[in-house]
Amino acid sequence: DRRQRQMCIRDRYKPLSNKYLDEMFKHIRARFGGYNVAKHSTAREVIKLRREGRRIAVGLITDQSPNRSEAHYWTTFLNQDTVFMDGAERIAKLMDFPVFYCELERTSRGYCKVLFDLVTETPKQTADGEITECFARRLEQTIRREPAYWFWSHKRWKNKRKESVQHG
């Protein structure tokens, strides 16, 4: 079946409070054949596609500072106490998907290549936080090597840890 051989492209996004702008941005994001999935529906969408026998690759951009409600994993990152979203790790463990670290390498003006590095083929066998910690270490290496390419305005350290939260 042709549909099962095609790769499903889903764009995880945070819905905007302004419904008009939300629809406009969804339309812009979907113009190349992607399909928008609200961030709170990501795991359900992945499960649905897997049940349908569809080929799935889940790419999550997780270098931004999470909202307090999303703050799940704390570690030292660039010498700062930093919180990371752990949704990618949770989905990988739920579905037992292999995990790759992905980075872009600029080759010339306007061109880059995408590099994938295997983190684990067996996420269910990893300790809680291990995948997210590996991501944090790899991201830190990437930033130290190419600091100009990181988007520094993410307000990465706006969240402060409560004393009761465990450190990664």
Where are these regions (language model features)?
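Small-molecule pocket liners
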Residues: 5, 34, 74-75
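Single conserved hydrophobic/aromatic residue that forms the stacking wall/gate
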Residues: 1-9
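Non-catalytic C-terminal accessory region of glycerolipid acyltransferases
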Residues: 40-168
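Membrane-interfacial amphipathic helices and adjacent loop/beta segments
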Residues: 12-41
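A generic signature of intrinsically disordered, low-complexity regions enriched in glycine/proline
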Residues: 5, 26, 67-69
